[in-house]
Amino acid sequence: MTEYKLVVVGAGGVGKSALTIQLIQNHFVDEYDPTIEDSYRKQVVIDGETCLLDILDTAGQEEYSAMRDQYMRTGEGFLCVFAINNTKSFEDIHHYREQIKRVKDSEDVPMVLVGNKCDLPSRTVDTKQAQDLARSYGIPFIETSAKTRQGGDDAFYTLVREIRKHKEKMSKDGKKKKKKSKTKCIIM
């Protein structure tokens, strides 16, 4: 069974834990209890493949930012979460993405942009803004509501699909490099 290491990142209070707990335990947590770091595991079937999701729910608070490099190193894919009623959390996505790319030493890291709390009427981040940002990053965008379950499972499953695509691409690139190296070998 394939295991996928997913990391949920974003500013404090955007609903990272609520989304994760909704996926794992099928219930909505409405009280805010800042996370330091929680780990969850769940076996699911995605596109006919049984897999194990190893989900790291991270701290959004700035005082825990020193821990970020460590969990970014181990993650295979990242849900970058902002709240649709919090413009600052949307602006912070850029910093999380840059840090992930720096730590992974790669421009190509599986990510999904997630606009959470779409059940709330007090939207300050327009859907089009988020779609444009995701398009500029070359990643999918999904609006979610941990409260109503809208899009939550889809966000995690889409991230797994992004990781699969990334692994496929990397293995194809690896095979191309191996083939190329065979043709360049000259013995004198």
Swiss-Prot record:
PROSITE patterns: RAS. Interacts with PHLPP. Interacts (active GTP-bound form preferentially) with RGS14. Interacts (when farnesylated) with PDE6D; this promotes dissociation from the cell membrane. Interacts with SOS1. Interacts (when farnesylated) with GPR31. Interacts with RAP1GDS1. Interacts (active GTP-bound form) with both SHOC2 and PP1c (all isoforms) to form a tertiary complex; SHOC2 and PP1c preferably bind M-Ras/MRAS, but they also bind K-Ras/KRAS, N-Ras/NRAS and H-Ras/HRAS. Interacts (GTP-bound form) with MAPKAP1/SIN1; inhibiting K-Ras/KRAS activity. Coiled coil: none annotated. GO terms for biological process: Ras protein signal transduction. Ras proteins bind GDP/GTP and possess intrinsic GTPase activity. Plays an important role in the regulation of cell proliferation. Plays a role in promoting oncogenic events by inducing transcriptional silencing of tumor suppressor genes (TSGs) in colorectal cancer (CRC) cells in a ZNF304-dependent manner. It comes from Monodelphis domestica. Gene3D superfamilies: P-loop containing nucleotide triphosphate hydrolases. A motif (Effector region) lies at residues 32-40. This is GTPase KRas. SMART domains: RAB, RAS, RHO.
